[in-house]
Amino acid sequence: MEEESISGLEVRFYQTQCLSEDNVIKFENNGYPMIDLILFSDAYQIQRNTSIPIETVTLIQRNLQRLFSSVPINGYQHYLDVKEFKTHYSSGIKLLDQLLGGNGFTSGEIYELVGNTSCGKTQISMCCSLNLSQQYNSNIIYIDSSNSFSPPRLIEIFKSNYLIKQRQKQQQKQQQKQHQKQQENNDKIEQDKILKILDRIKVFNCFDSITLLELLSTIDSTLSIISDEIPTFENQFYKGLKMVVIDSIGTLLAPIIGGKQTQGHYTMMMISRLIKYIADTYQIIFLITNNTVGGNSFDNKAALGEAWSMVPNHQLMINHQYNDDENEERSIYIEKSTRLPVSIIFIINLYWLF
């Protein structure tokens, strides 16, 4: 028996929270098994044939159009929009900001940290999340695929990078006795700051690609409501959202791609398109970590293949090696970028002070 050919445009491949299993069955049983049939058919005709509410049909068509449509824009107008709406955010790491053009992260762009296991991708992600929360009072969504997010480690980085500097300034201005009297009050202030920083970072545990797709869809739908100026109490967090961290994309997508897993490849493409759409439409920074695989020349390269390599605007490679039995040296450089020079290397220390 010949294997049935798959085009990747079957409705079932694009099942989401809106396009539920029940709706998929109704589409398939009433002559709409393919995406193009849904997009090019009249919404009221679909409603009559499938008995799906017209509001749901319209919403499904709109979401599918976001994935498959390409609207041309004027180049000069695009330049003006970019110049007006782009915002820069420091990563909290001075040399990393210099590596990224001198201004740190740029809103609406996708950054990918690539490296072997235990090379420091999660540490940099937490450090950048910490700085955006502490310096800009921004909200961050941290999507964790391996329970790597560690609040105690975040507090340790906070104390090392910020509180030590503040105490040094206080010691220069105050006498030792006055500093000892105020130590208890300072500890309380420090604890309040840490709690506020942690409160602005929302962590989601995610262990498969479908959950990731649903999370991104929720972010998109919530931000679209806010952009229409209809905020609710639950959406206040998203109003101040500036960064989404995905740690790690390789863990989520690697099991579903490769070989004859056609559906997995299209799921990856759906996720990549949604990430690009959210980043560009709502000017959200995406910081994504990825694993490495062996290249042809015994050099490591980013996992997930060439199709995924076109997703990030900037790809940063992290290397680490042992100089002797005790010392481990890590370095980071830009492997690929749409606008930044590559191959500039600098060293990382224990507390990510470059």
Swiss-Prot record:
Q: Which residues bind ATP?
A: G115, N116, T117, S118, C119, G120, K121, T122
Q: Which domain of life is it from?
A: Eukaryota
Q: Which InterPro entries match?
A: DNA_recomb/repair_Rad51_C, HRR_RAD51_Paralog, P-loop_NTPase, Rad51D_C, RecA_ATP-bd
Instruction: Please provide one cellular component term from the Gene Ontology annotations of this protein.
Output: replication fork
Q: Which SUPFAM superfamilies match?
A: P-loop containing nucleoside triphosphate hydrolases (SSF52540)
Coiled coil (UniProt feature)? none
A molecular-function term among this protein's GO annotations: single-stranded DNA binding
Q: Name one GO biological process term.
A: telomere maintenance
Compartmental location: Nucleus
Q: Which UniProt keywords apply?
A: ATP-binding, DNA damage, DNA recombination, DNA repair, DNA-binding, Nucleotide-binding, Nucleus
Which family does the record assign? Belongs to the RecA family. RAD51 subfamily.
What the protein does? Answer: Involved in the homologous recombination repair (HRR) pathway of double-stranded DNA breaks arising during DNA replication or induced by DNA-damaging agents.
List the protein's name: Probable DNA repair protein RAD51 homolog 4
Q: What is the lineage of its organism?
A: Eukaryota, Amoebozoa, Evosea, Eumycetozoa, Dictyostelia
GN (gene name): rad51d
